Amino acid sequence: MNKLRLFRSFFAFLLPFGMATGAAHGALTVEIVGGAAQQIPIAVVPFAQQGVIPGQQDTIANVIGADLRRSGLFRVLETRGVANQPSDISQVNYQDWAAIQAQALTIGNIETLPGNRLKVSFRLLDVYKQSQLVGMEYNITPSQLRLTAHKIADVIYQKLTGEQGVFATRIAYVSKSGGRYALQVADSDGYNPQTVVSSAEPIISPVWSPDGTKLAYVSFEKKKPIIYVQSLVSGQRTVLANFKGNNSAPAWSPDGKRLAIVLTHAANSQIYSINADGTGLQQLTRTTAIDTEPTWSPDGRYIYFTSDRGGSPQIYRMPSSGGEASRMTFEGSYVVSPRLSPDGKSLAYIRRDGGQFRVALQDLQTGQVQVLSDGPKDESPSFAPNGRMLLHATRVGGRGALAAVSADGRVKQRLSESGGDVREPAWGPIISQ
């Protein structure tokens, strides 16, 4: 296969959507399969309310429970059979919760405040030790109730697992419905989708800035691939790269100052870096091969990328300033779409096995590889910012859908949008708030 055909085959796999039509872009729905070998049994009591909060009666408890459940690490217990439903620690009868085998208990209340504000308070309790693990209060607007529930779930997750939660993060993805493409940003559970930009032409390769305030992406609206950077705060959009030929595959450096990009303006597909304001273009690879899909290591020292310089697509690593590249993958004849785990210890990618494209995870110290997803047409892996889960695109019933799989392969989720295709996922960073 010549290099032009190979380059086209990369993007024939990564680019096209199905021709499905449907309604306007909507929220994603989550289906969960599997769980960790040892799940923590936890009870989340519906929060008591002081004052009238229309339409929000069970939002907090339901969202917290759903978040913990979809992590695969918790077994969320049914609470309706327990007669005493406490909202304050003085009301807790620990024997009631020990009887349903709860190890942890979450209680709380929502209070209306002047000026259309709410005070949300919660406590996480250790049922066995009959003590409080953590308690917090939030002063919010009604529109922040779901986000607050995600934050509470993050606190619970971190307290009980020792790892940072990611429920309050956001995801970006591209949907297609009714012949239009839309770059969407939604909560990590698929709720509250917001359109960043829409077009009659394809949009691909969204990637978050490290501070979570911007998205870089590729749009074909000018009948050629151009890289844009768009602020999620102001909505302002700027052109990052519009050189002769193709401009594709943006990837932010960990400090947010530069992006690695792929250009064909000189000849074949090569990797460059560029300042975030579009200045300071620097060529990093100079080969006769196809070099594409760059991604930075978390420490900023290296760039991993896909290249066919060995005869078939494989993953290579080079210094972030350019220089000699080392091959990183040796299992499989077709390996693309590298992504580094947040701790830099694992490399995720798409590997073709027997005509099936699946997400695989490679330990960079031992070289051990584990196939995580089921295929047959998985693509675009993206790590959660705590490294526990990977989001990726797949095909279900002829439509594009998003899926997530835990880094150990035990927990699998599917996120689908009724009436349209979704793909090109990118999991946003944890933002301090």
Swiss-Prot record:
Subunit structure and binding partners: The Tol-Pal system is composed of five core proteins: the inner membrane proteins TolA, TolQ and TolR, the periplasmic protein TolB and the outer membrane protein Pal. They form a network linking the inner and outer membranes and the peptidoglycan layer.
Keyword Ribonucleoprotein: no
UniProt keywords, alphabetically: Cell cycle, Cell division, Periplasm, Signal
NCBIfam families: propeller_TolB
Cross-referenced InterPro entries: 6-blade_b-propeller_TolB-like, PD40, Tol-Pal_TolB, TolB_N
Encoding gene, per UniProt annotation: tolB
One GO term of the biological process aspect: cell division
Signal peptide: 1-26
Cellular component aspect of the GO annotation: periplasmic space
Residue ranges of coiled coil: none
Family: Belongs to the TolB family.
Protein name: Tol-Pal system protein TolB
Matching SUPFAM superfamilies: TolB, N-terminal domain, Tricorn protease N-terminal domain
Annotated function: Part of the Tol-Pal system, which plays a role in outer membrane invagination during cell division and is important for maintaining outer membrane integrity.
Chief localization: periplasm
Compartments reported by the entry: Periplasm
